[in-house]
Amino acid sequence: TQSPKPIGWTYFSAFWRRVALENKLDPETAGYIGEKFNAFLPNALGIKPIIKYLVENPDALWINMVIFTIVEGIVGLAIMFGLFTRIMSIGVFGLAMGILLGSGWIGTTCLDEWQIGILGIATGFVLFLTGSGKYSLDNYLMKNNFTITKKKWFAWLGSGILPIKESVFPRVVLIGSLFILGMTLMTNQIFHGGVWGTLHNKSVKPKLEITDGKITENRLSFDVFRTEGVDVY
């Protein structure tokens, strides 16, 4: 039987660190998670306008950080216990996709954020196909014939045999696998040049951009942004 606990802890631990161990959801304290969100902006793929809007609107950013953290906590905890595994696997897929597109380019020594994102996507897809295993709450509910497990929707949201025709199931597996393979190669190439050409790492070498330069009454003023490097603002 498969064990989804490591991927579950990956997401639940993010919730635990921000809420239980420290208060990283308070904008007035050091280590506020919203500050780290700035680092995603320069090279985010596909969701850059969303990140830019949130960075420029602190109230909206805070609300989204709270929602994101709560979702991570619920999804992670449910996955660890194997409860409503399939619907939670969709949550894993979505969270991982956000990490991949937003911060997949970040990593000073290895492709750590990219790896977290792409492995989360693959794991979410596999968990949806298989459901949870023997040592899960889903299996406990089914084994003891709880009424909820008799509902048609439980196989889609929980575990058990997927109600997909046997002739169609291989196509679902193939299409999903090809999509994930495509995302793997595409993002690895865009973020790191890992498929062909010259390797690059935009997290290592800092890059500064100077804008709005002007001289007023013999005083020079300008805006400086660090757009590439370990931390960017």
Model-derived segments and spans:
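Extended, low-polarity transmembrane helix blocks
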Residues: 1-53, 58-70, 83-233
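Transmembrane alpha-helix interface/packing and boundary motifs in multi-pass membrane proteins
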Residues: 75-84
